[in-house]
Swiss-Prot record:
Tetramer of two alpha and two beta subunits. Pfam families: tRNA_synt_2f. Its EC number is 6.1.1.14. Keywords: Aminoacyl-tRNA synthetase, ATP-binding, Cytoplasm, Ligase, Nucleotide-binding, Protein biosynthesis. This is Glycine--tRNA ligase beta subunit. It is found in: Cytoplasm. Belongs to the class-II aminoacyl-tRNA synthetase family. It comes from Streptococcus pyogenes serotype M12 (strain MGAS9429). InterPro entries: Gly-tRNA-synth_bsu, Gly-tRNA-synth_heterodimer.
């Protein structure tokens, strides 16, 4: 007869960003625990609030399934001594399995007999197995952890309660400094300690204590309440998904309300207002039906609507203090001169091992000028790139960015326009930070693209040059994000400059402030980012084949990955790759000084293959180029079928290997085909 299991871990307030992944982790770890312990179940449902993580298992078997396992031991000739008695090796083997030699039988495997024993283990009651469920809680991993009281252990937050119920029976367990029971805590202000009656009554028991344990239900409540406010007030609310996910993990019983602020603050740039509300106060932004910002906000209270007017006033007061700061900085920053701010950047440290921000900008300016030539920018765009590179970090010293660092670049654009800078320069100041997150928006203008690349390239090379190279998951200077940004920009804009040549050209530059070093490490790091981008769809062998190609042009590499993945599902993929792989492997024996001499050809197949290689232009898209190379497969096979490549005559051998080397030199611009797996 199946049962339902409930586990709830009651904790001190969790950071909002930890709640959802921890809820998911708990469910996954418990499912693994039950499976490994042979306890079948029908379904798992997880719950979470800022003060609890919980999971309920439905249809849990009341007993483990019985286990029957066969174990292979030593060969019979080792298991028996000269008198036919079991040797110490055989005795030790069965002893290790908890059995005696009576359990031994011999089975033939590939012509030889071996010792085998079969072990039968009766399933234990679920209640007994579940005593080990604290292993699941102990194995939980978190981005942060802490000690409390005088305990030697640490956890994400102090644990207050542990409830483990099998139907309505409370199991007694010890975890950290807590003994389990059936007591849970209600809402911090609206509830009290309460008893969980059974696994099935969990939601209802806590709902009576003003706690909605189902995160999805809380989210639906918040959205529904916001929609009601929209209808009542005739407005639109920006329900930002990230903010919604954060807010639902800040509350156990949500109540949405609308507050107001003076319309005068709408004269401050919208980005400042939105940042103040969304990022700092966790408020939702309100707009009119035309999409214009309104002097209102929506917030979500952790509680009911009791004394809601006081709550609204308190939230309005806090927001106004933020908006006052924004208005003040907006007004005062406009009195500053860009040239003065740029001059002060010589005193701002980029990194103590690398130098000042001004020196970083100087290097970026030189790199940007080089990139502008490669990108064939117009004279006006080249001028804009140069000007932007001279000033693009000035806003870091403004009061606004000092208070709201999320607005770096955004305020730089606005202040630059107010100061009379060209629009292309101002836009590039904002765009050079892009992309600012995985999958984030990319710069859209050529000037912005060049400045973004130059800034990221110097950042990457500078940190690597002083030995600050990411290792493992440790990347304090966000160099992976910067490099991923470089790769994404190059791919999106189809910039076909070879990455190795680009990096080589940067290492040829000379600066008084820094000498670039560790080029090999830089290239490997960039390759790893390209590999990651390909890894979204391409298997390992395809990625390795492309990374081993003779071309390092990012857009082409990603296009080839897509083309190879599609081709791998076709009938001619395997034979084409196998013939090319054979050519690649033989070409490794080529003498680079030997050129193909057609006068040494002894059969038509040599001539046909050589002519086909000479006519191979590899034009068009990656898929078309791949098709052209694959089309040579019959010609290559015909060549191998009728030609002894490794001939005894050294001249013939060298000439035939040279033919294959010519083929490989062209095909390898696409991929190292001998790295591909056709099994």
């Amino acid at each position: 007869m199946s049962k339902n299991l409930l586990i709830e871990l009651g904790l001190e307030e969790l950071p909002a960003y930890v709640v959802t992944p921890s809820e998911k982790q708990l469910g996954e770890r418990l499912a693994t625990f039950l499976t490994e312990n042979r306890l079948s179940f029908e379904d798992i449902q997880t719950f979470s609030t800022p003060r609890r993580l919980a999971v309920r298992v439905s249809g849990l078997a009341d007993q483990q399934t019985d286990l029957t396992e066969d174990f292979k031991g030593p060969a019979k000739k080792i298991a028996l001594d000269a008198d036919g008695n079991f040797s110490k090796a055989a005795q030790g083997f069965v002893r290790g399995k908890g059995l005696t030699t009576d359990a031994i039988e011999f089975r033939e495997v590939k012509g030889e007999e071996y010792v085998y024993v079969t072990k039968h283990e009766a399933g234990k009651p679920a209640k007994e197995v579940l005593l080990g469920v604290t292993e699941v809680l102990s194995a939980m991993t978190f981005p942060v952890s802490m000690h409390w009281a005088n305990n030697s252990f640490e956890y994400i937050r102090p644990v207050h309660t542990l409830t483990v119920l099998l139907n309505d029976e409370a199991l007694e367990l010890d975890f950290l400094d807590i003994h389990s029971g059936r007591v849970s805590r209600g809402h911090r202000f609206l509830g009290t300690e309460t008893t969980i009656t059974s696994a099935d009554s969990y939601e209802a028991d806590l709902r009576s204590q003003c706690v909605i344990v189902d995160a999805k239900e809380r989210q639906e409540m918040i959205v529904e309440q916001i929609k009601t406010l929209e209808v009542e007030q005739g407005v639109q609310v920006d329900i930002d998904e990230d903010l919604l996910n954060e807010v639902l993990n800040l509350v156990e019983f949500p109540t949405a309300f609308m507050g107001n602020f003076e319309a005068k603050y709408l004269d401050v740039p919208e980005e400042v207002l939105v940042t103040s509300m969304k990022n700092h106060q966790r408020y939702f932004v309100v707009r009119d039906q035309a999409g214009h910002l309104m002097p209102n906000f929506v917030s979500v209270r952790n509680g009911n609507d009791q004394a809601i007017e006081n709550v609204i006033k308190g939230n309005e007061k806090v927001l106004v203090a933020r908006l006052e700061d924004g208005e003040f900085f907006w007004r005062e920053d406009q009195k500053l001169q860009i040239a003065d701010l740029v001059a002060k950047l010589t005193n701002v440290t980029f990194h103590e091992k690398i130098g000042s921000l001004a020196e970083h900008m100087d290097r970026t300016r030189v790199i940007a000028a080089s990139l502008a030539k490669e990108a064939n920018l117009s004279a006006e765009e080249v001028t804009a790139v140069d000007r932007a590179a001279q000033i693009y970090k000035f806003d870091l010293l403004t009061g606004m960015v000092g208070e709201f660092d999320e607005l770096q670049g955004i305020m730089g654009e606005k202040y630059a326009l107010l100061a009379g800078e060209d629009a292309a320069v101002a836009t590039a100041i904002r765009e050079h930070y892009l992309p600012d997150a995985a999958g984030g928006a990319l710069p859209e203008t050529k000037v912005g693209v060049v400045l973004a690349l130059a800034d990221k390239l110097d950042t990457l090379l500078s940190f690597f040059s002083v030995g600050l190279i990411p290792s493992g998951s440790n990347d304090p200077y966000a160099l992976r994000r910067a490099t991923q940004g470089i790769v994404r920009i190059l791919d999106h804009f189809g910039w076909r400059i070879p990455m190795d040549k680009l990096v080589d050209s940067l290492y040829d530059l000379s600066f008084d402030s820094l000498t670039y070093t560790n080029k090999a490490d830089v290239m490997n790091f960039i390759r790893a980012r390209v590999d990651k981008m390909m890894g979204k769809a391409a298997p390992k062998d395809i990625r390795e084949a492309i990374l081993a190609s003779s071309t390092f042009v990012v857009p082409e590499m990603l296009a080839v990955a897509e083309a190879l993945v599609k081709a791998s599902h076709t009938e001619n993929y395997k034979p084409a790759v196998e013939s090319l792989s054979r050519a690649f492997n033989l070409a490794e024996k080529a003498d680079a000084s030997v050129q193909v001499d057609p006068s040494l050809f002894e059969n038509e197949q040599e001539n046909t293959l050589f002519a086909a290689i000479q006519g191979l232009t590899l034009a068009g898209s990656a898929a078309q180029q791949l098709e052209q190379v694959f089309a040579l497969s019959p010609v290559i096979n015909d060549f191998f079928d009728n030609t002894m490549v490794m001939a005894e005559d050294q001249a013939l051998k060298n000439n035939r290997v040279a033919i294959l080397s010519d083929l490989v030199s062209k095909a390898k611009t696409i991929a190292a085909f001998n790295q591909l797996n056709t099994k």
